[in-house]
Curated annotation (Swiss-Prot):
Residues 2-55 form the ClpX-type ZB domain. Gene3D superfamilies: 1.10.8.60, ClpX chaperone, C4-type zinc finger domain, P-loop containing nucleotide triphosphate hydrolases. This is ATP-dependent Clp protease ATP-binding subunit ClpX. InterPro entries: AAA+_ATPase (IPR003593), ATP-dep_Clp_protease_ClpX (IPR050052), ATPase_AAA_core (IPR003959), Clp_ATPase_C (IPR019489), Clp_protease_ATP-bd_su_ClpX (IPR004487), ClpX_bact (IPR046425), P-loop_NTPase (IPR027417), Znf_CppX_C4 (IPR010603). ATP-dependent specificity component of the Clp protease. It directs the protease to specific substrates. Can perform chaperone functions in the absence of ClpP. The keyword Methyltransferase does not apply. Belongs to the ClpX chaperone family. GO terms for biological process: cell division; proteolysis involved in protein catabolic process. Component of the ClpX-ClpP complex. Forms a hexameric ring that, in the presence of ATP, binds to fourteen ClpP subunits assembled into a disk-like structure with a central cavity, resembling the structure of eukaryotic proteasomes.
Length: 418
């Protein structure tokens, strides 16, 4: 029976984690054992993780677009349109690889992907989750650190080296991997007219990326390039590596709105301010000519035929991000507090304050952790030295810095019905 010696005979305990009925929301009784709601949730997570490795696959051995999208839903809130585009593009890419040796009369070209969306909207997380679903090597690169070969900075070939390292130097696995290049909007040339001066970190990098994105056999130095000139190089064919490029493209919405508005003047002109529309809605109308005007070269745009745009995250979406995903921030901090034997309780008002602050800072989901850290800093500093605290309540006033967190001890918690 799940009771402990010395305790009241009426107190029941979870047979798995040992928590009492007063420490958990629900205790479910079996014939001879009890299980709490927290252990049930943990079991569900284990089953979900196991199911993820047994995704429904087509005859090609590739997960279906619907299954890919379903797993993306577990980690990324909203962005349904972008998730559908990515799911289809990734499914087609790996289906193409599965059939590469079977039928050579028609060669299907590779479709690399461009993700356009505001900071903190989930571009990086989408790319990382895709690689995890497909169990392929994944690496990230920051376009702002890249320069043309021969200049101070990181060579484009270093991206392939990182992918090779992610594949434990298994060349065959690396050749089926995914590369995510962030901040590609920062390597746009400064105007849409070709420059007579050398642009080693802008147009020059775009030119250098073209080669590996289209498909080439790159000679990769296993120990890094410039410091070990005598080492033997590994040959990596980039033809089947999927490249996903992402960027915020600040100001692109104005270029799109200007194109849509035309050059009308006089009484019949459309004088609507583009800011009246949501940025995400405007970005969805993006055309190659807009990216060209932004500063990407035509050849680079041509290597990225699939364009997925992401929406701005509103307050409701940010609150969902804080609470719903498997690795949601509230769950992460809740687990940290559990390690101290304390339950963390964020009220709805507190979550609204956190979301509103992220919107005000224009940091999207990326800024949520920083805001949570600031709110919980003093609590996490004091808590390890406090005795008999069973629950910490963070409400709207605490989140705004106008009040101290509410520490509930055993007796107080029982009185409040927690």
């Amino acid at each position: 029976m799940s009771t402990k010696s010395g305790d009241s005979k009426n107190t029941l305990y979870c047979s798995f984690c040992g928590k009492s009925q007063h420490e958990v929301v629900k205790l479910i009784a079996g014939p001879t054992v009890f299980i709490c709601n927290e252990c049930v949730e943990l079991c569900m997570d284990i089953i979900r993780e196991d199911n993820r490795t047994h995704l429904v696959k087509t005859r090609d051995g590739v997960p279906t677009p619907r299954e890919i999208c379903k797993v993306l839903d577990d980690y990324v809130i909203g962005q349904d349109h972008a998730k559908r585009i990515l799911s289809v593009a990734v499914h087609n890419h790996y289906k193409r690889l599965a059939h590469a040796q079977k039928n050579n009369d028609i060669e299907i070209a590779k479709s690399n992907i461009m993700l356009v969306g505001p900071t903190g909207s989930g571009k990086t997380l989408l790319a990382q989750t895709l690689a995890r679903i497909l169990d392929v090597p994944f690496t990230m690169a920051d376009a702002t650190t890249l320069t043309e070969a021969g200049y101070v900075g990181e060579d484009v070939e270093n991206i392939i080296l990182k992918l090779l390292q992610a594949a434990d130097y298994n060349v065959e696995r690396a050749q089926r991997g995914i590369v995510y290049i962030d901040e590609v909007d920062k390597i746009s040339r400064k105007s849409d007219n070709p420059s007579i001066t050398r642009d080693v970190s802008g147009e020059g990098v775009q030119q250098a990326l073209l080669k590996i994105m289209e498909g080439t056999v790159a000679s990769v130095p296993p120990q890094g390039g410039r410091k070990h000139p005598q080492q033997e190089f590994l040959q990596v064919d980039t033809t089947n590596i999927l490249f996903i490029c992402g960027g915020a493209f600040a100001g692109l919405e104005k270029i799109i709105a200007q194109r849509g508005k035309g050059s009308g003047i006089g009484f019949g002109a459309d004088v609507r301010d583009p800011t009246e529309q949501r940025t995400g809605a405007i970005l969805r109308e993006v055309e190659p000519e807009d990216l060209l005007k932004f500063g990407l070269i035509p050849e680079f745009i041509g290597r990225l035929p699939v364009v997925a745009t992401l929406e701005d995250l509103d307050e409701a979406a940010l609150i969902e991000i804080l609470t719903k995903p498997k690795n949601a921030l509230v769950k992460q901090y809740g687990r940290l507090f559990e390690m101290e034997g304390v339950k963390l309780n964020f009220t709805e008002d507190a979550l609204k304050v956190v979301a509103a602050r992220a919107i005000q800072r224009k940091t999207g989901a990326r800024g949520l952790r920083s805001i949570m850290e600031n709110i919980l800093l003093e609590t996490m500093f004091d808590l390890p030295g406090l005795d008999s605290v069973e629950e910490v309540v963070i409400n709207g006033e605490v989140a705004e810095g106008r009040a101290n967190p509410l520490f509930l001890h055993g007796k107080e918690r029982a009185e409040t019905g927690s």
